Amino acid sequence: MKVALLGAAGGIGQTLALLLKLRLPVGTDLALYDISPVTPGIAVDISHIPTSVSAVGYSGEDPSEALKGANLVIITAGVARKPGMTRADLFNINADIVKNLVEKVAEVCPKACIGIVTNPVNTLVPIAAEVLRKAGVYDKRKLFGVTTLDVVRAKTFTSELKEKHVETVKVPVIGGHSGPTILPLLSQALSEGLPLSFTQEEIEALTYRIQNAGTEVVEAKAGGGSATLSMAESGARFAVAVFKALLGEDCVRYAYVESKEGSGYPEFFAHPVRFGLTGVEELLPIGKLSEYEQAKLDELKPVLEADIALGKNFVNP
């Protein structure tokens, strides 16, 4: 079984490569690809770490060698956010990069699962879907946007606010992966399996912080980058869990995937997902929303739908 990481020399990619080397199951092949000539060296560097995961690096314009035989492809390639940029500002550059990479996936390993980390996820996942559709290989079970960082942040910030042990806290996060499209369901938040209670003021402040946490990091880094380390750790959590699901382990994670037709949700939406041998096996119920959450959901739908349309129109102008 093989994982290919595209964008392995970037701020997220290098850390993610390290974490995958440490956490993937014994015997996994890890292929690292980036346009940068340092990529083979990154693979040599992590190959000195004593785990039973083999790492090989590839650089240049063509990722085909890295993709051969891949079961799971994780895409982190693209430019990062800088101060003053929104995730949507990244679109013009990253849309082309992801489109070209997914075209290669469609050609070289069309049955592989694809996890997209590169932003703007809301728009790039629909681009990938259209590229795969054009190539005649689209399978909605095998394409997902990685929104794990929103879940991780919700868990961390909620545990800090409520002074609970972070490992015991669970907070669902649905919707999209930018600003107001990120919707934490604090009405369903649990600690040690018991519901947590919040004042309305706490709900509004916590929701705002989770939605704008990316900007918090960009500003704190004072022009020196965006959220790379927490994103890499979240990406590793997701990639390892999904890879183990492909090997037969039970796995439920939140991810931005194609919705069921007639569900009332936008065409792509972050749901709780049961992953299995073929990728997405089942979209699980989102559960009952509070009035506040329902209002936020109604607000985010047109924003997310516009993001999705932007992606589809990029491939089919």
Swiss-Prot record:
UniProt keyword annotations, A-Z: NAD, Oxidoreductase, Tricarboxylic acid cycle
Residues annotated for substrate binding in this entry: 81, 87, 119, 153
GO cellular component, one term: cytoplasm
Catalytic class of the enzyme: oxidoreductase
Pfam families in the record: Ldh_1_C, Ldh_1_N
Gene Ontology MF annotations: L-malate dehydrogenase (NAD+) activity
InterPro entries per UniProt: L-lactate/malate_DH (IPR001557), Lactate/malate_DH_C (IPR022383), Lactate/malate_DH_N (IPR001236), Lactate_DH/Glyco_Ohase_4_C (IPR015955), Malate_DH_type1 (IPR010097), Malate_DH_type1_bac (IPR023958), NAD(P)-bd_dom_sf (IPR036291)
Subunit structure: Homodimer.
Name used for this protein in its record: Malate dehydrogenase
Origin organism lineage: Bacteria, Pseudomonadati, Pseudomonadota, Gammaproteobacteria, Pasteurellales
